[in-house]
Amino acid sequence: WWNLDDARYEIPKNGNKHSMFAGALWIGGVDAGGQLKVAAMTYRQGGSDFWTGPLNTTTATITPDECNEWDKHFKITRSEVEDHVANYLDPTYVMPDIIENWPAHGDPSQGQDFNLAPFYDAGQDGGEYNPYDGDYPDYNISGSNDNAKLFGDQTLWWIFNDQGNIHSETEAEPLGLEIHAQAFGFTADNEVNDMTFYNYKIINRSTLPLN
């Protein structure tokens, strides 16, 4: 929503109106020993509690190199996926890079979860993402996929965690969270056209339950 100096949450585009300066998740939990653990952010001027990338599912850790590798947003549109579903068998079809390289799976050498970015397994490849066999990022293209996990007409998807380094913002103990996030918007002829929405899947990768 901002670039560390100026507001960037501008809606509508080129309207020079910024309804938000900064925003972040604030998450806290208490373990069985009564220890409070927190991950939260304000303006990133005093530190950070969050870093990019998926955690090792066994150790709830991540290397700095992996954080850097995942320091990105994956931008996709529903129309790109609709076109892919309609034309992937056409020999003249050129598959968009975002569909071909959709981050569906984690890196097993880093202990990451096999399933990351959601996709529809149209080819029934045993859960392996293969867009050349008709698989696609998981919008409800058919109209009957009520379990679809991607929303909107344009979507930004990314992963972040609270284990990439010490919590220099709150100075609290980490929770061991891996968070799958998406920001999305719709093309509409009403107020929804000028809105954005957010969805977070919050996973506790630590070995301890938190309340």
Give names to the regions the model predicted.
Residues 1-211:
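A long-range scaffold signal marking pre-active-site subdomains of enzyme folds
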